[in-house]
Amino acid sequence: MASLKSLQIVSGLLTFVLLLTQLLAHAHVVQAENIDAAETDRFCYPESSKNTRRSCECSNVSASPWGNRALRIDCSYKDYRSADLSLVLPLYIDSLDLSWNALDSVPILSSDTLHQLNLRHNNVSQLVAGNFKLLTSLRELYLGWNSIGRLEAGSFDGLPHLQVLDLAHNNLHLLPGQLFAPLLVLGTLDISWNRRFNESGEDLYTGLGVNWKLSTLRLDACNLGDLHLPVNAPLKELSLRRNQLKRIPAQLPETLLRLDISDNLLEELLPEDTFNLTQVRQLFIEDMPLLQRVMSNALAHVDVLETLSFQNSRQLSHLDAEAFGPTMTTSTKKTALRSLSFRGTMLRTFNSTLAPLFTQLAELDLNGLPLQCDCELVWLKQLPVETNGRCYKPARIRGMLVTSARGDAFSCDTWPRWAYGLVVLSLIALSAAGIYLIVMGLRPHRGVTMRRKVGAGSPYARVTIEPNRQENPH
Ligand SMILES: *[C@@H]1O[C@H](CO)[C@@H](O)[C@H](O)[C@H]1NC(C)=O
Ligand SMILES: *[C@@H]1O[C@H](CO)[C@@H](O)[C@H](O)[C@H]1NC(C)=O
Ligand SMILES: *[C@@H]1O[C@H](CO)[C@@H](O)[C@H](O)[C@H]1NC(C)=O
Ligand SMILES: *[C@@H]1O[C@H](CO)[C@@H](O)[C@H](O)[C@H]1NC(C)=O
């Protein structure tokens, strides 16, 4: 009995202590929250812009599974200049959007929680050393759509956790050596649309110090005439759209999974273009202004390719029967290819040696091709997928889907054209000869005429005039 009572007392005491600690903790949280709130207000609703559209939107979200607090601040489209911003960011800030303002330099902001900073669409023309060094937790930095042309060495110092760096649509040209070296875990780098980047002359990896383990690199519209990247760098995605490349660069990382080489100056796709792309699963050869031919074996080495697109390469008019390798292998080999697009090209026909390959596809896009629907192409009707290919010739089925046009309309002239010519010519010759013969046949024969003229029955025959015996009776 006594022991039960003491147990009850102990448990009561325990509950009390527990309650007390909870209460204290709560008070502490409330106090901290009050401090944050004041600080947040100072940043989000500054005195100078109270009750105007220039105040930022601040929202609390609970990020991460542990329910840590995180503050997202959206100050986009506010016409802010650098001097308008408070440099110390509120506690718990996670992301700050300063896009579409009028910042002409990057303010040296300070926060040890900020993960994402968006400065796109401002008027920043240069970065100075240590520009981001007080943002020690930064993971993503978006600096696209400015006019950054000058970067001091050390511009990216103090960003050991940065994973994504966007420098697209700027004016990068001469860059200090080892510029990117402080970015130890950088995974994605976008330098697209820096039209003078070809002048930088430095090798990205050894010269500019890009993280060896970079996985995504974008170099669209950088006026590149050639490119060498280390073969053994573990790069996964590379975009080289809209450059001045005449061949697919021979030396690219072996690990590439996705390559976009669209809108470059290739005229033909050759076997050496794809020879080293042994791991590529997605290959984009779109919008090529000059590409006319895909030569035999041009795509024979890309065994693991899943997606291939020639979309909108408007000069492309020849796809070799053996573009995907010798006929023998295409008919037996199981390829990984699932999606193939020739949309908007000038291809008229496909050799039936491609049938086994096309039959495996889950997607084949033939929209807008001027297809020549003759007996060579009738196999296309048998494909299990809808290609949206339409006949352009012959004229009587123009515009009809290959699948809905009648099979017997896909006919070929069994004789070659010159044979028709020959037949017509010989017909003309024959009838000429016939007419000649008829004319000759109808014309009176000279011998016959003479005989008739002087023959016995002819009125012109010789007559003998006998004397009139009645008038001279002797
Ligand atoms: C952008 O900066 C340049 C100088 O770098 C200046 O001449 C120009 O007026 C600025 N534009 C805006 C919209 O502030
Ligand atoms: C960069 O590209 C421009 C435009 O194509 C060209 O005029 C210039 O010579 C190139 N510079 C280098 C160093 O390749
Ligand atoms: C493939 O890569 C190797 C190693 O970089 C290179 O020597 C070779 O020329 C490349 N082959 C072709 C056909 O480009
Ligand atoms: C299709 O390709 C094979 C093998 O290259 C070739 O012999 C044949 O003539 C081609 N057919 C047509 C209609 O071009």
Residue locations for each model-derived region?
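Extracellular leucine-rich repeat
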Residues: 2-474
